[in-house]
C-alpha cells in the first residue's frame, strides 16, 4: 500500500512539473457535497453551504424555577388560595412570577361560583403575591365566624380563612348592617366578599331571619346589589346551597360601604395590589424541576436562542414567537454548487461559473492555479471577510425584530361567554397566522440578501483580477484566466494579493498572444468556419447535380415526361 501511494505522488508531481501550457488561474468558491435548502423571495428551494434552523421544536420535560419564580398551587387553584380554602393555607404570603395551576386542583370548602371568575383570576395572578391585610369590622348584633361541615380543617368544621360568615344573632335578630371602610393608604385594595344562596326558605329564615335578604356593596364609582337566589340545587359535598363571590377594588382616597339585611359573606380584610408587578398564571400538569429557563409553556420550559418556536401557543416569559411552521432556515453561507467528481487530478481547475470547490475549507472564496511549478489552491480571506461581515449579526438582528417580551395564556370563559371565547380564539388564530406569514417573509428576505451578498463578493473578486491582468490574460468564460506570460508561484501570489504589476509582463504577454493567435483559432471561430465550409460544399454539390441534369436533357440522354 505504501509503494502504491508513493508511486501516485510521484506521478502527480511529475505531471505537474511537465506542464508546458500557459499558466492558468481560476476563481472559485467553497462548496459542500450536501448543502441545505432554504427559501428566498424568488425561489422555494435554494441550496446553500450552511444554514441555521430558527424554529425551536424541542422542550424540556419540566418547568424551570429559575430565573422566574414559580409557585405550585398543587391541589389549590388561585381563587381557592385567595379565599383561604382548607388545604391552601400554605400559600398564605406566597409570591410568584408564574403561579402554576394544576388540572387536578379541587374545591375543598363550601360550593361556590364567581360570576366574574376570569377577571378575578387575572387580577390575582398579575398581582404576584398573596399579601393579605387583616382589618377590624364592627358588625353589630349578628353572629360571626359561621362554619360548615363541608369545609373541615382536620376534624373541625371551618370556613374560608379570609372570609366571615355572618348569621342572625342568638336573639334571633339580623338588623341592618351598614359599615364603611376608607382607603387612606397609598395602594389599591382588593376586597373579596360573597352572598349565600340557601336552598330553601326555611334555611333562609333559620340563618338570617329576614326573607329575602339583600347585600349591597358600594364605592364612589361603583355599586353591586345582590338578592339571594333561594332554591334547590344539586348536592355538592353535602350541600345544596351556594355562595357567589364578588370582588371590589378600592383606590386610594376612596371608600367601600357594606349594606346588608342578610346573606353577606363578609371580608376579614383586603389584598394589597401591586401595580408594578407583572406576574401571570399557567395551567399545566408538567412538574417543576431544577433547570434554568426564562420561557415556560404548558408542555414544559424552553431553553433556546432561536427566535421562533412551534411547541405551544401558550407561552410565558421571554419566549420565542409561536409560528405554525415546523422549520425556517436562515442562510448563513453562500449558494452551494457541489463540485463535480469526474475531472481527474486537476479537473477542478474549472472556475466558479461551473461549480464550487469542496476543498476550499479555510475561506469562502479562493484561487486555483496551474503553472510550470505545479498546481495550488489558496483562499481569499479579504473577500471572505467582507461577506461574513455583512452576514454576521443577521441572526441577532432577526431576534431583535421578534424579541418582544410577552405572555400568552389560555383564556377561560363561563359557558354563557361562549361567543366571546370563539371571538378570542379567532383573534388569536389570526394573530398567529399573521406572525407565521411575517416570519416566513422575513427569513426569505434575509436569505435573498445573503445569497445576493455572497454572489456580489464573488463578482467583485473576479473583476479585481480581470482589471489586474487586462490584456496579459484571456478570460476563458468559466471563471478562469489563461495567462500569456511565464507566471511562477510568486507571480500567482501577486495576482491573489492584488500586487500584480501588469506593465512588467505586458510585452511578453503581447508577443505570446500574437504568436498563439497566428496559428490557433479559438473554438468559436472554428465553429463558424466549419459551418460556412459545409454550407458552400452543399451548395456546390447541388449546383453540379442540376448542371448535369440539364446537360443530359439537352443531349437526349435523359427524357422527362410529365403525365396529367
UniProtKB/Swiss-Prot annotation:
GO molecular function, a single term: host cell surface receptor binding
Record-linked SUPFAM superfamilies: Influenza hemagglutinin (stalk), Viral protein domain
Extracellular side: 23-527
Transmembrane segments: 528-548
Site (Cleavage): 343-344
Post-translational modification: Palmitoylated.
Disulfide-linked positions: 26-480, 64-291, 76-88, 109-151, 295-319, 487-491
Subcellular location: Virion membrane; Host apical cell membrane
Record's bilayer topology term: Single-pass type I membrane protein
Cytoplasmic face residues: 549-564
Domain of life: Viruses
Keyword Disulfide bond: yes
Entry keywords, A to Z: Clathrin- and caveolin-independent endocytosis of virus by host, Clathrin-mediated endocytosis of virus by host, Disulfide bond, Fusion of virus membrane with host endosomal membrane, Fusion of virus membrane with host membrane, Glycoprotein, Hemagglutinin, Host cell membrane, Host membrane, Host-virus interaction, Lipoprotein, Membrane, Palmitate, Signal, Transmembrane, Transmembrane helix, Viral attachment to host cell, Viral envelope protein, Viral penetration into host cytoplasm, Virion, Virus endocytosis by host, Virus entry into host cell
Pfam families: Hemagglutinin
GO CC terms in record: host cell plasma membrane; membrane; viral envelope; virion membrane
Signal peptide segment: 1-16
Glycosylation sites: 18, 34, 178, 310, 497
Main subcellular localisation: virion
Residues covalently joined to lipid (S-palmitoyl cysteine): 553, 560, 563
Subunit composition and interactions: Homotrimer of disulfide-linked HA1-HA2.
Job description of the protein: Binds to sialic acid-containing receptors on the cell surface, bringing about the attachment of the virus particle to the cell. This attachment induces virion internalization of about two third of the virus particles through clathrin-dependent endocytosis and about one third through a clathrin- and caveolin-independent pathway. Plays a major role in the determination of host range restriction and virulence. Class I viral fusion protein. Binds to sialic acid-containing receptors on the cell surface, bringing about the attachment of the virus particle to the cell. This attachment induces virion internalization either through clathrin-dependent endocytosis or through clathrin- and caveolin-independent pathway. Plays a major role in the determination of host range restriction and virulence. Class I viral fusion protein. Responsible for penetration of the virus into the cell cytoplasm by mediating the fusion of the membrane of the endocytosed virus particle with the endosomal membrane.
Sequence similarity: Belongs to the influenza viruses hemagglutinin family.
HAMAP family referenced in this protein's UniProt entry, alphabetically: INFV_HEMA (MF_04072)
Protein name (record): Hemagglutinin
Species, as recorded: Influenza A virus (strain A/Seal/Massachusetts/133/1982 H4N5)
